[in-house]
């Protein structure tokens, strides 16, 4: 298999692990910076160049796309798709998951439970918007934030109103959610590959914080997700069109609640904590999907 990995940084742990495992499996692998890919769009002739040379002949591409380059990098991924290259996470699926509002709407439509969420635009509606949510504490989230950045806990209604008005003044898109106190500032990261959860870790927020992201000083321990939690995680990934995803859940009195579905979850924390070789699970999944495609006589390139 000729495999491309879309990544801006070849030194990142996740990128290095995927390259290492794929080469160990006998595949030809190349890391491509999506911002150095440029494309020609012509009826019947989708093509792409990278640093002055044509890109062609790739059987699969694994996207490791950062939030800041989502728009351009998904256009590059879409061009790969139009050229007949398989991706475990298609461009449209990444766009769905990166837009928190859209993702929440799609998940709720599939009967997947989440913290109650409200969204609005006009400042005149702020008070009624918050009343739809219920009493504080409230969690205010930027619509396109990542790694816990742009997530604020508001413990008073007046503070929530002030935050909402300030963010609107900055023309920022955001959601406001109920705060689930019984989660005790912890969540589960369920790593989905294909139709199963291949690894799980429990993340606990640092003292004085409520965000459990490891990038913000949270800690992680090995965990086992219940059958219900695994089912919810897989359904959440598939509802957005993803086959590789990090699904973040919290445990509540009404069952598991989905916080977020990450289309490019990091491998370092989950592999170190769970002891699972997640990278090889991803490469195996790509191999299996390509075999299925080829057996259907539509194998490209």
From Swiss-Prot:
Binds 2 magnesium or manganese ions per subunit. Its cofactor is Mg(2+); Mn(2+). Its EC number is 6.3.2.-. Mg(2+) 1 binds at residues 248, 260. Coiled coil: none annotated. Belongs to the RimK family. This is Probable alpha-L-glutamate ligase. It comes from Xylella fastidiosa (strain M12). The gene is rimK.
